[in-house]
């Protein structure tokens, strides 16, 4: 289910509202004692994008995610509430600064997280960025990254240094597993 709505005050000042929901359950009730289906995944999202003026926009996002760590074989799901504020300011046609703050609230797994990003883009090819992610729950660990990227056509080169946690990194619908590490990362992305 997807919903979209725009409220326009003027040509350069307007709000865009979006909402999306999706879910998946087990195919039949054979995995449960009472014959009911079990939740595998639930994803409910709402965001509001405000264009304050031609150069400045802010996006507010809320996402509620529930998923079954046992893929429906056992009862119980993990639940996360995610809040994001992203602000972008176009200094001129070639320079943009962007900041983002995220908060993930959960009583499950590693519990609460907070993250931030600062990025400066020199159009059309260069950007520099710094990120910080901190676990407020179980581990109390900081994960930081600073880097630079260059793009031309369908090719992108990124050089960064930081402390990264293990997990899947997804970009453009392509995901890869990355082990935990602290160090330098060189990434080349090309589309054919």
Predicted regions and their residues:
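Exposed, low-structure sequence patches enriched in small/polar residues
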Residues: 1-192
């Amino acid at each position: 289910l997807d919903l979209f709505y725009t409220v326009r005050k003027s040509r350069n000042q307007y709000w865009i509202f979006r909402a999306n929901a999706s879910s998946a359950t087990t195919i039949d009730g054979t995995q449960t004692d009472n014959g009911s289906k079990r939740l595998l995944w639930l994803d409910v999202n709402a965001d509001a994008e405000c264009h304050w003026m031609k150069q400045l926009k802010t996006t507010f996002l809320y996402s509620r995610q529930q998923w079954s760590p046992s893929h429906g074989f056992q009862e119980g799901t993990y639940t996360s509430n995610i809040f994001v504020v992203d602000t972008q300011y176009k200094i001129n046609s070639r320079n943009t600064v962007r900041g983002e703050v995220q908060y993930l609230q959960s009583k499950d797994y590693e519990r609460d997280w907070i993250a931030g990003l600062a990025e400066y883009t020199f159009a059309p090819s260069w950007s520099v960025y710094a990120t910080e992610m901190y676990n407020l729950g179980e581990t109390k660990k900081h994960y930081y990254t600073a880097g630079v990227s260059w793009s031309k056509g369908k090719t992108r080169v990124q050089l960064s240094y930081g402390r990264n946690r293990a997990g899947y990194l997804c970009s453009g619908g392509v995901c890869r597993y990355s082990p935990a590490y602290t160090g330098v990362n060189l990434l080349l992305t090309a589309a054919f």
